Regions:
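N-terminal "arm"/small-domain region of PLP-dependent enzymes with the aminotransferase-like
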Residues: 1-41, 46, 53
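Short aromatic-enriched loop/helix-cap "lid" or pocket-rim segments at secondary-structure transitions
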Residues: 15-19, 155, 188-190, 217-219
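Short, solvent-exposed loop/turn segments at secondary-structure junctions
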Residues: 8-12, 75, 99-100, 148-150, ...
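Active-site PLP attachment segment
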Residues: 184, 191, 196-232
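Conserved core of the PLP fold type I
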Residues: 34-172, 183-202
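A short glycine-threonine-serine/GTX helix/turn-capping micro-motif
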Residues: 234-236
Length: 236
């Protein structure tokens, strides 16, 4: 048997199909009228409120559903963020040296150039990130990082590294795009907090997804952001 470690594919047999069917029928009874209307640019309000509640409980900080927009999976969020934050083809974005192939394709497809930073067991190396930021001739548009269960290395960024990343991004006035699409693939030990939960900053953008725990074919993702980035993304 051959496993493709580049793809975050959950075993389809592990999803409770019958329970999901019953839940879907209940949802239609409860939200059927709303489902027959267009929900606006941010997505269905009740679902946005539920995702905001989910993140509030996970992160331990209050998440405002007004700052949350539903996405067609996390990859739509990844792409829209890139389009919203870039100014022109050739703009730079910082990523881990090895990152998700879909993100590489999406960013190269819209003309971004990726600058890779090596990772070790604790995630992206902050000493190398700082050195690269000081050396680059032009300022990158943002830092993109898979903080937990990074694809393809599987590393999880330590809390100390997360704090250092936040401080470095603030020092160089850079937005951070935290893609936490693998955050639910967690089985033991303490979960690391999201960046926005450690030190809230309007330059932090957060991408979440249910695709690893809830019917990947539904393509349910979401983005948390504040002004002015939120408006830039929603208007795409």
């Amino acid at each position: 048997m051959i496993y493709d470690f580049a793809v975050g594919q959950t075993n389809p047999e592990t999803f409770p199909a019958e329970a999901l069917k019953r839940a879907a029928l209940r949802a239609i009874d409860l939200e059927g009228a709303a489902m027959n209307r267009y929900p606006g640019g941010k997505g269905h309000l009740a679902l946005r409120e539920l995702m905001a509640q989910r993140e509030s409980e996970r992160a331990g900080v209050s998440v405002n559903p007004a700052n949350l927009v539903l996405m067609n999976g996390s990859m739509q969020a990844v792409t829209l963020v890139g389009q919203a934050l870039m100014s022109a083809p050739g703009d730079l974005v910082i990523t881990e040296t090895y990152t998700y192939s879909g993100t590489i394709a999406a960013y190269k497809g819209i003309g971004l150039k990726l600058v890779g930073i090596l990772v070790d067991a604790g995630g992206m190396r902050m000493d190398l990130l700082e050195a690269r930021l000081k050396m680059l001739p032009v300022k990158p548009k943002f830092i993109y990082t898979l903080t937990s269960y990074q694809n393809p290395t599987g590393t999880t960024m330590s809390r100390q590294r997360r704090i250092e990343l936040i401080d470095l991004a603030a020092q160089f006035d850079l937005p951070i795009v935290e893609d936490n699409c693998y955050g639910d693939v967690h089985f033991e030990g303490e979960k690391q907090p999201s960046l926005y939960a450690i030190k809230p900053d309007p330059r932090h953008l957060y991408i979440g997804s249910l695709s690893k725990i809830f019917a990947p074919g539904v393509r349910l993702g979401y983005l948390l952001a504040e002004s002015p980035y939120f408006q830039q993304i929603v208007s795409r």
